[in-house]
Amino acid sequence: MSTKITLDPVTRIEGHLKVSLDVEGSTVTRAYSSGTSFRGFEPMLSGRDARDAAQIVMRMCGACHVAHGRTGLEALESIAGATIPNQARLLRNIIQAANFIESHLLHFYAMGLPDFVSELPTVGSMTVTDSLLAVGREGSLDESVLRDHAAQAISIRRACYELIALLGGKIPHPSGLILGGTTVFVTKDLFDSVQKLCETITGFTSSIPEGDVELLATAYPTYESLGETGCGHLAHGCFPDRAGNPMMKKGFLAADSATVASWDDVEITESTASSKLAGPSPLAPFSGVTEPDLSKSSAYTFAKAPRLAGKPFEVGALSRALVNGSTPAHRGVWARYRARAAEARLLSAAIATWLTELEIDVMSAPEEAVTLGSGQGFARGEAPRGALGHWVVLEEGRDRALSNHLTDDVERFSSR
């Protein structure tokens, strides 16, 4: 006998998600993930001055706002042929890295850990949370260590927020990211404050998150293979050096290959066959349509279905790790958490290095205003949760009907 289970809304995410499962016995026979909200950022931008875009697209997400802002700016800068000052590149890298670290700590300690421990500590206004413990615990687990670290992680996340606010103007949605550079003027006092925050963050991320993941992996060994998708892994690359080469490389690792390959953007398409969206399907991003159509009988979600060469793909910290040479025995739950924890450590060290390259009392804004005319451009980027892209067409400095955004969540919650 088949049973239908519906979770609506799914909590501990940033968005509107419903999951429906058809279950026979103990086996899930069919599953649907539904984006239940029409976001409409593309039509919202149509006809607007393109310089508004970066601040607007940051509102797509409260967790990966920096990545959307930066990628949106880079798409516009590609149209203008603008090269940002080195000081601005360093500051964008530092701001985005701090956003990655905060998001990884949020994901593990606030969104994931409650499933694996009996309760979390009371910290300030945060109340004790009872947990429905995940199935599969086979080993002993010292929960007190994890509870202590979860409390410390809140302070470290705050340090990340403070760092972003100091260099980006505010948090979330930093206003200091502008076309052609950033607005911050790094004084000696500002530098000293940021460096102190970096030391605080590094003191935690250098070993604690990775150790905590291993504690859980020992207690819940079956989660090593749980969640393996069999899909390929895509990474867009991020944190460029002065020559434009990304610290985290870009590439695609097919499911049946051990070799990282390049790909052509023409291979990326988005289908709306199962989406409550109008237009022919599938379409390349530069031809994309984002208009609601509630009359489609087969539609069950507002999410599109992105494909690379016609196949679904996975994105995120694990994908970045695989593309950059990691070879885990399994690609399940713990591989994903290990990848996030390792990134938190690596990016903390990277921030310390970028700080040594910053110049004191040097402008990070462009010497001359960047002028936007007509043309089309795109940029690919990485958010903490995975790869994203912005494709833009301008007419006389304004967004034309097309301003298409491929987000990491759309890739993760792809429709059929």
Show the residue positions of the predicted features.
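Active-site bordering "gate/hinge" segments
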Residues: M1-R385, E395, L406-R416
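His/acidic/aromatic-lined binding-pocket segments of jelly-roll/cupin-type domains
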Residues: V392
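Catalytic-core signal marking the mid-to-C-terminal active-site face
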Residues: R400
